[in-house]
Amino acid sequence: MLYALLLPHVAAFHAFNLIRYITFRAGGACLTALVVSFLLGPRLIRWLKSLQKQGQPIRADGPERHLIEKKGTPTMGGFLILIALTVSTLLWADLRNGYVWAVLMITIGYGALGFADDFLKLTKRNTKGVPGRIKLVVQAVLGLGAAVWITQLMPGSIADSLAVPVFKHLMIPFGPLFPLVAMFVMMGASNAVNLTDGLDGLAIVPTIIAAGVFTLIAYLVGNRIFSHYLEINFVPGTGELAVFCSALIGAGMGFLWFNAPPAAVFMGDTGSLALGGALGSVAVATKNEIVLAITGGLFVVETVSVIVQVFWYKRTGRRVFLMAPLHHHFEKKGWAEPTVVIRFWIVAMILALLGLATLKIR
């Protein structure tokens, strides 16, 4: 919005020329989202508490202390993230850019699905929410729509291929099936963040870290000079997603202020499904789907732990982990919640560095 409002007046007010620079607008987006979160957070939390007298339903089969320590904490805090992210993006991004709208669509769409899930959990007082099959169908429809939209915006030479990091210009062609691959990336990322969101601050910090990595990736991929120098795919227009990712960082930090242990609010599926969808769609748009799996490796490991646990239990009647997802396994082993969370953050930082390294290793 500011881009469209200020750009025509650059000749009269030279300072407005700053609005041309993605880096300036990215910084503004991050700061704006942070301020919106700080201003809106206390009011939103009070409102959620007034609506949710008993707070988020807690899993009866989870760690015992959760039934005591987390009882009464309101959920749907993802509203705070979505509002701050959307307001900041609309304010600072170039709204003529199709990638921005596609990524916003999947983020808000998955957030709406998460809201429905949280609402059913609260009204029915259980941890089930929207039936799994219905949730997957809605995710698939939204993801496929966004995937088709994004691929239509891309240069035809790379639109239907999956980029392989490290190897120069190695692309795996999928042809007309690529939107299905992109849909899987978005759905997988969304559900992976959702599974990771089980402890105070556990999901939001790795999300912020991944968003930081993709802020840089979006800027480089959308810049002809830098992409040529690094020998990565040049995708015109995706530089604008650096503004979106920066807004996500600011919104995430603002939410963390209230989600730090002991959490005053949980993001719920409203936040976790939306955040994963945001990361997945940005990865698809920047042709860095595999890099997301590396950078967000913590989310991948958490998801795999659930898949392995369910598969092995159905096959043998025994469990591989004391409890899944993996963070609950370590809780059951006696690790304190802050210990689990901080160590997982460290792992997320290491994986983010590995993801960044793929940009230079060729």
UniProtKB/Swiss-Prot annotation:
<dbReference type="GO" id="GO:0008963">
    <property type="term" value="F:phospho-N-acetylmuramoyl-pentapeptide-transferase activity"/>
</dbReference>
<dbReference type="GO" id="GO:0046872">
    <property type="term" value="F:metal ion binding"/>
</dbReference>
<comment type="similarity">
    <text>Belongs to the glycosyltransferase 4 family. MraY subfamily.</text>
</comment>
<dbReference type="InterPro" id="IPR003524">
    <property type="entry name" value="PNAcMuramoyl-5peptid_Trfase"/>
</dbReference>
<feature type="transmembrane region" description="Helical">
    <location>
        <begin position="339"/>
        <end position="359"/>
    </location>
</feature>
<keyword id="KW-0131">Cell cycle</keyword>
<keyword id="KW-1133">Transmembrane helix</keyword>
<keyword id="KW-0573">Peptidoglycan synthesis</keyword>
<dbReference type="InterPro" id="IPR000715">
    <property type="entry name" value="Glycosyl_transferase_4"/>
</dbReference>
<dbReference type="Pfam" id="PF00953">
    <property type="entry name" value="Glycos_transf_4"/>
</dbReference>
<feature type="transmembrane region" description="Helical">
    <location>
        <begin position="100"/>
        <end position="120"/>
    </location>
</feature>
<feature type="transmembrane region" description="Helical">
    <location>
        <begin position="170"/>
        <end position="190"/>
    </location>
</feature>
<feature type="transmembrane region" description="Helical">
    <location>
        <begin position="75"/>
        <end position="95"/>
    </location>
</feature>
<feature type="transmembrane region" description="Helical">
    <location>
        <begin position="225"/>
        <end position="245"/>
    </location>
</feature>
<keyword id="KW-0812">Transmembrane</keyword>
<comment type="pathway">
    <text>Cell wall biogenesis; peptidoglycan biosynthesis.</text>
</comment>
<feature type="transmembrane region" description="Helical">
    <location>
        <begin position="201"/>
        <end position="221"/>
    </location>
</feature>
<dbReference type="GO" id="GO:0008360">
    <property type="term" value="P:regulation of cell shape"/>
</dbReference>
<dbReference type="GO" id="GO:0009252">
    <property type="term" value="P:peptidoglycan biosynthetic process"/>
</dbReference>
<keyword id="KW-0479">Metal-binding</keyword>
<dbReference type="InterPro" id="IPR018480">
    <property type="entry name" value="PNAcMuramoyl-5peptid_Trfase_CS"/>
</dbReference>
<keyword id="KW-0460">Magnesium</keyword>
<dbReference type="Pfam" id="PF10555">
    <property type="entry name" value="MraY_sig1"/>
</dbReference>
<dbReference type="GO" id="GO:0051992">
    <property type="term" value="F:UDP-N-acetylmuramoyl-L-alanyl-D-glutamyl-meso-2,6-diaminopimelyl-D-alanyl-D-alanine:undecaprenyl-phosphate transferase activity"/>
</dbReference>
<keyword id="KW-1003">Cell membrane</keyword>
<dbReference type="GO" id="GO:0005886">
    <property type="term" value="C:plasma membrane"/>
</dbReference>
<dbReference type="GO" id="GO:0071555">
    <property type="term" value="P:cell wall organization"/>
</dbReference>
<keyword id="KW-0133">Cell shape</keyword>
<comment type="function">
    <text>Catalyzes the initial step of the lipid cycle reactions in the biosynthesis of the cell wall peptidoglycan: transfers peptidoglycan precursor phospho-MurNAc-pentapeptide from UDP-MurNAc-pentapeptide onto the lipid carrier undecaprenyl phosphate, yielding undecaprenyl-pyrophosphoryl-MurNAc-pentapeptide, known as lipid I.</text>
</comment>
<keyword id="KW-0472">Membrane</keyword>
<dbReference type="GO" id="GO:0051301">
    <property type="term" value="P:cell division"/>
</dbReference>
<keyword id="KW-0132">Cell division</keyword>
<protein>
    <recommendedName>
        <fullName>Phospho-N-acetylmuramoyl-pentapeptide-transferase</fullName>
        <ecNumber>2.7.8.13</ecNumber>
    </recommendedName>
</protein>
<feature type="transmembrane region" description="Helical">
    <location>
        <begin position="21"/>
        <end position="41"/>
    </location>
</feature>
<feature type="transmembrane region" description="Helical">
    <location>
        <begin position="247"/>
        <end position="267"/>
    </location>
</feature>
<keyword id="KW-0961">Cell wall biogenesis/degradation</keyword>
<feature type="transmembrane region" description="Helical">
    <location>
        <begin position="290"/>
        <end position="310"/>
    </location>
</feature>
<feature type="transmembrane region" description="Helical">
    <location>
        <begin position="136"/>
        <end position="156"/>
    </location>
</feature>
<keyword id="KW-0997">Cell inner membrane</keyword>
<keyword id="KW-0808">Transferase</keyword>
